[in-house]
Amino acid sequence: MTERKRNLRPVRDVAPPTLQFRTVHGYRRAFRIAGSGPAILLIHGIGDNSTTWNGVHAKLAQRFTVIAPDLLGHGQSDKPRADYSVAAYANGMRDLLSVLDIERVTIVGHSLGGGVAMQFAYQFPQLVDRLILVSAGGVTKDVNIVFRLASLPMGSEAMALLRLPLVLPAVQIAGRIVGKAIGTTSLGHDLPNVLRILDDLPEPTASAAFGRTLRAVVDWRGQMVTMLDRCYLTEAIPVQIIWGTKDVVLPVRHAHMAHAAMPGSQLEIFEGSGHFPFHDDPARFIDIVERFMDTTEPAEYDQAALRALLRRGGGEATVTGSADTRVAVLNAIGSNERSAT
């Protein structure tokens, strides 16, 4: 990765992000957009929507064009019976950017959105300036057991119960009570965000889309689609990894494994943060993103170099870090439970 002296772009007063819609392949795609300059695409996680970025969107838009979409099946985008795999989501992001006439982008992905961001970089490297992974899914199969259980048939039935009168309010009240009791623990840290996401699930098409999305990436054993076998392909792309130490959805060791598997990547750990570090410390998150944008050159797509890299492959020589981390990465790459796209 090429670093450069920090290039400070002018800060402008800009209008707040506006909610807009485009129809792509017959489906309505919602997104929030603000600012001008180099483009940043913010991709949210499963069950979430573009408003999750509200604390950082407007500030970043003072220096960049910032687009935060609602993924298909989420927020105010349509929720059809469709393909909700990470590859399909990456295709959808490519198509939305094309409709918006945006040729290249720095892609920021949180949770499931991190997996989508990695898949986007894998499928469309010619469109990627930089890659920022925030508590990203798809590093190894490990994921919180709640998601494993929710991927089972009984999980869909449990989500259907949320549509019954008074069930969701009761769950939210119970959650707040539990949150007060465990608020200082890792589990309690992210509970408000979990309750916020639950607000959307009683709507039938939203809960169905959530279930399809979850089952596309998780089963009872954990995450089915992992990125470690292809991380070496980011060799020519500037990569920033951000994670919280109290993340109970995707443990912070995933950050160190991804960092070890991505040559030249940068790593920032938010001490005391949970699964949403950009909520816990938005000012620090903004500073990291801006500094990363300012001190790295956009990736230069070289088809011949990519072809040579693919032929050479990854393996032990491309993994860095401590001995324990390297062993963990290589063991995960060699696992027969891994499924690549």
From Swiss-Prot:
* Family to which the UniProt record says this protein belongs: Belongs to the DmpD/TodF/XylF esterase family.
* Keyword vocabulary terms for this entry: Hydrolase
**Which residues carry out catalysis?**
S111, D247, H275
Q: Name one GO cellular component term.
A: plasma membrane
**Entries under Pfam families matching the protein:** Abhydrolase_1
User: What name has this protein been given in UniProt?
Assistant: Uncharacterized protein Rv2715
- Give GO MF terms, alphabetically: hydrolase activity
What does the record's miscellaneous section state? Answer: Was identified as a high-confidence drug target.
Q: Does the keyword Magnesium apply?
A: no
